[in-house]
């Protein structure tokens, strides 16, 4: 992408139309050769109340994984925040109501990191996203465990509530990317 003077965000947003907030890019989603992963990019209005943003975030990729025993069902895996230059700045997780997918425990989701079909990808953005998951395996595992811990704590505070549907609870966990730690 660097040689072509582009980045992952520019790769999924059409160059012939203006960026629209809350719209999924690409519209048909990234499909990863039908091998159990999918993703899309979008951004939110800066003024949206209760929204989470990393400092300097332009938008983010939501990444999903197909549930192995139920091939028609998908689970939100993690979101990847991107800055205005199209570079990744952090991973985060959101509550179930945000994306409406099936909920899988951190323990189950972490196992998917051991089975990423990287070598079978042909599209550059899909290879790039999967490579970030591989390189940041430990960070992603930690953010998923923290996500589940937050749900457990909240459930303890309000036992009868369905915490995963609580619209007052958007962000569950986050971790900024520190390239010095990743590359050393």
Q: What is each model feature region?
A:
Residues 1-32:
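N-terminal domain-onset segments
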Residues 7, 22, 33, 83-84, ...:
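Detector for Asparagine
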Residues 12, 33, 50-55, 85, ...:
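Low-complexity, charged, repeat-rich alpha-helical/coil interaction segments
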Residues 28-92:
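Aromatic- and glycine-enriched beta-alpha-beta binding-site module
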Residues 38-39, 110, 168:
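Intrinsically disordered, low-complexity segments enriched in small/polar residues
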Residues 66-134:
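An exposed acidic His-Trp-rich patch
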Residues 125-184:
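Long, compositionally biased interface segments
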């Amino acid at each position: 992408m660097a040689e072509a003077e582009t980045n992952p965000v520019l790769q999924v947003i059409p160059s012939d139309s203006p960026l629209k907030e809350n719209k999924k890019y690409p519209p048909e989603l990234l499909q990863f050769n039908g091998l159990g992963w999918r993703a899309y990019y979008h951004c939110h209005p800066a003024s949206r109340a209760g929204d989470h943003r990393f400092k300097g975030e332009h938008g983010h990729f939501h990444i999903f994984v197909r549930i192995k025993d139920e091939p028609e069902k998908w689970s939100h895996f993690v979101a990847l925040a991107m800055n205005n230059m199209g570079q990744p700045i952090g991973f985060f997780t959101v509550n179930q109501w945000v994306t409406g997918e099936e909920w899988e425990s951190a323990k189950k989701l972490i196992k998917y990191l051991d089975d990423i079909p990287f070598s079978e990808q042909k599209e550059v953005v899909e290879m790039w996203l999967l490579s970030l998951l591989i390189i940041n395996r430990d960070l992603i595992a930690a953010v998923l465990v923290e996500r589940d811990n937050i749900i457990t704590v909240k459930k303890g505070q309000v036992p009868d509530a369905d915490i995963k549907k609580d619209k007052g609870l958007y962000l569950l966990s986050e971790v900024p990317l520190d390239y010095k730690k990743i590359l050393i």
